[in-house]
Amino acid sequence: MMTTEEEVLSPDDRDFVTALASGLEVVLAFDEAHPRMTLSEVAARTDMNRARARRFLLTLHALGYVRKQGRYFELAPRVLQLGYAFLSANNYRSVIQQVLEDITAESGESSSLGVLDGDAVTYVARSSAPHRLMAITLSVGTRLPAAHTSMGRALLAQLPDAELDAFLERVTLERYTDKTVTDKALLKKCILKVRQQGYAIADQELDSGLRSLAVPAFDANGKLLGAINISTNAARVDLDTLMREYLPLLQRKAREIRETVS
């Protein structure tokens, strides 16, 4: 049975391959905070028993996606092929990468392209300014909660009402700072405002001091490519500057993408 683009298999469906899902879960257990782990740590991170986690780790090791050093496991460079397959299949990235670099050159701030990936926004292109904005390193592949980021809200605003309501129903809103929106009714109001005005601001909701602005990016046919943003330090860039200087810049660059990418 083939599914439509909108249909998603449930884990209970007979076509759902649990072993594949679990193997990917093991790969995704490794991140910046957990680059090397023991078998017990992987089992705990994935909520698997040790025997099951061991089978997946050894299979990934045999396929070249995981390296084993004594008691520790870590991802091997071969996993980059998985991400590169996505990047190479989306040839518009080279155009957008140049746009992001132009934004950084004009503003002196970091700029990124993100796409909605489940309940998160995933960075697929980035131009970094010299100054660091968050405790974690933002790079291609970074995933952040869509509910609390400017790119996430810019993308959520593009969803049909039913899909937005489904997102709000299932998402868990964690508090990261004293400015984090944790009320779902208020979050929906914020997203609907973004839909109306065409841009999104996230002001220190995910990390104290991080202020960002995002707009959606479309190709010449009106297909949503993602959202582009500018990330700033709240102590350096106030909201007035964000709106007066950076919003027109982002809007101009979004038009440039639409005129260039077909």
Residue ranges and their predicted role:
Residues M2-S94, E101, R255, E259-T260:
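N-terminal helix-turn-helix
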Residues F16-L20, A76, A89, R93, ...:
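Short, structured helix-loop boundary elements
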Residues E74-V171:
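Amphipathic alpha-helical effector-binding/dimerization core
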Residues V95-I103, L168-A214, T260:
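Short, basic/aromatic recognition patches
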Residues R126-S128, E205, N229:
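Short clusters of small/polar residues that mark proteolytic maturation junctions
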Residues A217-A220:
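Sensor-regulatory modules in signal-transduction proteins
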Residues G226-S262:
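Juxtadomain coupling helices with adjacent low-complexity linkers
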